[in-house]
A protein has these predicted regions:
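Phosphate-binding site recognition
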Residues: 1-189
Length: 189
């Protein structure tokens, strides 16, 4: 996912997404971009092809990516994680991005370290690389790529924190609007 030579094989470029949508009488507007764009492969902006094709077919802006697989693998990998992962995850949710060490060459069966888990998140499409700090050292800035995946993150986060989605929304709003007491109350409930 970091090699620009292969970027075009991971999804649609903007020109390709635009051509597909125009063929079906749809436009590639800001709302579509916010929902399905946001992946970075190499230095290329890439759209989720599954979601673009489903949107072209139905004309309905909806989260199609979540239906491609279960997030059970990610949930299982997150179980029993150490404080380093918990702090990083909280920063990601609070700030929308995270600078961290990432081990890209990993599989589900090798997720023994926090760096490997972040690599699994990237390789599974939950996160994208916003910026390469040091490829040699494996240091990247990661972020949630788009609104479609953000919706899935809400469910994943509720499960990780063992809270309801409504409590999670209250917690996130407390963080977002710097209402620490509101966040603490939601977390305590």
């Amino acid at each position: 996912v970091t090699d620009k030579r292969y970027a075009q094989y991971f999804g649609f470029t903007e020109a390709e997404a635009k051509a597909v949508l125009e063929y079906y009488g749809l436009k590639l507007d800001e709302e579509v971009k916010a929902m399905y764009d946001g992946y970075h492969f190499g230095k290329e902006e890439i759209y989720n092809p599954w979601s673009i094709l489903n949107y072209a077919d139905t004309g309905e802006l909806a989260p199609y990516w979540v239906n491609t697989s279960s997030n059970k693998m990610i949930r299982k990998a997150m179980e029993g994680r150490d404080q380093a992962f918990a702090r990083g995850y909280e920063e990601l949710i609070e700030k929308g991005k995270l600078e961290t060490l990432v081990r890209m060459e990993t599989s589900f069966f090798e997720v023994s370290s926090t760096e490997s888990l972040w690599g699994l998140f990237v390789n599974a499409g939950y996160l994208t690389i916003e910026k390469v700090i040091s490829a040699r050292d494996g240091r990247y800035v990661l972020r949630i790529p788009n609104e479609e995946v953000q919706q899935e993150f809400r469910d994943l986060t509720a499960s990780y924190l063992n809270v309801s989605e409504s409590d999670l929304s209250a917690m996130i709003n407390g963080l977002r609007y710097e209402e620490r007491e509101r966040f603490a109350q939601s977390y305590a409930d």
